[in-house]
Amino acid sequence: MVIWKVVNKAPLALIKFYRAILSPMFPPSCRFYPTCSAYALEAFETHNFFKASWLSLWRILRCNPFSKGGFDPVPPHDGVPGKKED
């Protein structure tokens, strides 16, 4: 198992807790698809801790009343040799 997959287990658990317990208490308000929590889940499943944290934070900061929102998928790995995220 790749080390970043082990490190990402804690943030994944927190996001899943948020989605199962806290999110149902509030009306839907995310302006993007996938939702910010789904985006963060995918980011932590796809990227290392630091990149996933940055992508998730940047997405949450952009999710505000002044944003158009819309479709915003998690970017894939860049695939550059020697720049692996594991």
From Swiss-Prot:
InterPro entries: Membr_insert_effic_factor_YidD. It is found in: Cell inner membrane. Its main location: membrane. GO terms for cellular component: plasma membrane. Pfam families: YidD. Keywords: Cell inner membrane, Cell membrane, Membrane. It is a peripheral membrane protein. Residues 66-86 are annotated as: Disordered. Could be involved in insertion of integral membrane proteins into the membrane. Belongs to the UPF0161 family. HAMAP family: UPF0161_YidD. This is Putative membrane protein insertion efficiency factor.
